[in-house]
Amino acid sequence: MRKYTPKDNVQRQAPFSDRFFVSPSVPRFDISNDEIFSKDYESFTKAFKLKDAYIEHTHLVLNVDKNDIVEIMNFLSNELEYDMLIEMSAIDYLAAKDGYELFYEMLSLSKHKRLRIKCFLNKDDAVESITSIFDSANWSEREMYDMLGVKVLNHPNMKRLIMPDDWYDHPLRKTYPLQGDEAASWYEVDKIFGKEARDVIGPEQRDPAAIDRYDTERFARL
């Protein structure tokens, strides 16, 4: 008898795994290969300690201590002319490292160069807000908290950005179910019609591959 495998979200699963597959890696280059980055690196190391530094995809990548993040952003903006924060977020490494990797993508309009700041944040720690330096960090920091649960200190309006304020858990964590949890399946029914309508409507269908001809009729029964 064949071993049973769960059929939930089958469209998200690879149909087979190649035993000869080798995960692709991005080459890293020495900073001395770029004259502008070499000067930036030299100035940076005089002011801050670095955990790692390299060039990747034409970006200068600097791995720093999360406690220095506000001073580093000030330095990049005022001293090294990286005057635009174009992206920031976090990566969930809770299972492997019990924390998050935060990254801040910077652009220098005068040098036409991009620099990425990376730092590690333990699960129960918090990072300082940089909204006082870059206004564009406001929504990004809120999204980081909303989707991943990253705590940000001294933010002017630290609340959820995308999900409702009373939403349970953080949807972009790797432990969050692809179809959502039980609270998610009943959220809109409870909010709009009340829990007494659960037996009439049924839980929300959250499997994107499911096709049910009755979905369009259920609300009509109210």
Segments (PLM) and residue ranges:
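Terminal low-complexity/charged segments
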Residues: 1-222
